[in-house]
Curated annotation (Swiss-Prot):
The modification Cysteine sulfenic acid (-SOH) is found at residue 284. HAMAP family: BADH. The gene is betB. Its cofactor is K(+). This is Betaine aldehyde dehydrogenase. Keywords: Metal-binding, NAD, NADP, Oxidation, Oxidoreductase, Potassium. Binds 2 potassium ions per subunit. The lineage of its organism: Bacteria, Pseudomonadati, Pseudomonadota, Alphaproteobacteria, Hyphomicrobiales.
Amino acid sequence: MKAQPKASHFINGEYVEDTDGTVIESLYPATGEVIARLHAATPAIVEKAIAAAKRAQPEWAAMSPMARGRILKRAADIMRERNRELSELETLDTGKPIQETIVADPTSGADAFEFFGGVAPAGLNGSHIPLGQDFAYTKRVPLGVCVGIGAWNYPQQIACWKGAPALISGNAMVFKPSENTPLGALKIAEILHEAGLPKGLFNVIQGDRDTGPLLVNHPDVAKVSLTGSVPTGRRVAAAAAGSLKHVTMELGGKSPLIVFDDADLDSAVGGAMLGNFYSTGQVCSNGTRVFVQKAVKAEFLKRLKARTEAMLIGDPLDEATQIGPMVSWAQREKVIAYIEKGKAEGATLVAGGGIPNNVSGEGYYVQPTVFADVTDDMTIAREEIFGPVMSVLDFDDEDEVITRANASEFGLSGGVFTADLSRAHRVVDRLEAGTLWINTYNLCPVEIPFGGSKQSGFGRENSLAALEHYSELKTVYVGMGPVAAPY
């Protein structure tokens, strides 16, 4: 098998196998070929991973942030040196085109290790509070053992986005990737230990929906960070609440992308395509509700149709390929069902709408699809599809589109395209979302916070803000004189 790892799990600095666990077959989405066979973690494996993390964490926390940071920066360097290898693995794991993974996946993970490795001494500083002759100070302290639960759209990136702030803050982590994409996180663990990370601090275990509760409910776990769907987030948050664990939730979205009639239409079309078709539409922050002002709707759709139909669908390992398969057969079937629902409910099919005929074999392909004349009550305008399906809705004025854009249970992200920057800032101020873009879309450098509101989750990934979610404040009051007691 072309991507078989040394073993299913990485615990305490080494690969570990336990064949008693349920078999997990990793399939290459372009062909359906089995490329690796692993085993889900048994309760014994879960205990082994958490115990290793618990043992290793105190000594790691006692190191200076600068010393911890040096290791993370070495890991970033190794990831960049091995970018091609890691990118090809990510393509095999997810089906995303190599032209994407080579610029967006391992590199963004390396960015996270480099950023947190370099800025932590400043980000973890406390404060000094003068109180007359007395004073107080605060310091940030680690939480302990953190659990990261990843999604299947950006497996390597997510492992790094969670691992980097957790580790630099002095924590240990047990990371569980999605069973659909089990391979990348193992390589991240291997690289971290090659960079000098002490044993037990970053452990990877495989599993499915039965494994998560073993991690979330474990008494030695202090924090859970999940990237996943809203239903999964609700279950995890409810379980974590029972023992008052710290929680970060990065969940789904049905985000609005608003195009005003003064926008640069070519840029707006490009932004809409990036916000719907990148990674075959499997991006939580996608702007899948594209609101276009009526005066430019026809021209917008004309340009969008031409560019969408020109996209090259094919073998993800071919660098010319622009759109690859869905991650799994089940996800492809789900997306096809939504496309049929859009047709049945009266939306106008502009482009795509089915399975491409230029690919052969058992791959999980879907054409990039555009619907126009979509109304707010249609299923494709309300529910997260997580595939390459764009809904174009029209609008008359600013107040109307803001009201409609906010009429969603989700609040992850949104975007505005307009030449009027005063209007752009006015609109984003009123949009109910955690991450917003003006005249661009879906750019998420590690320097900026990323996260949502409403049913799209809470807490933030990336930037110095992430350190607040992997540490807590300790306050110390220092008395400088005799105690004045009334007793």
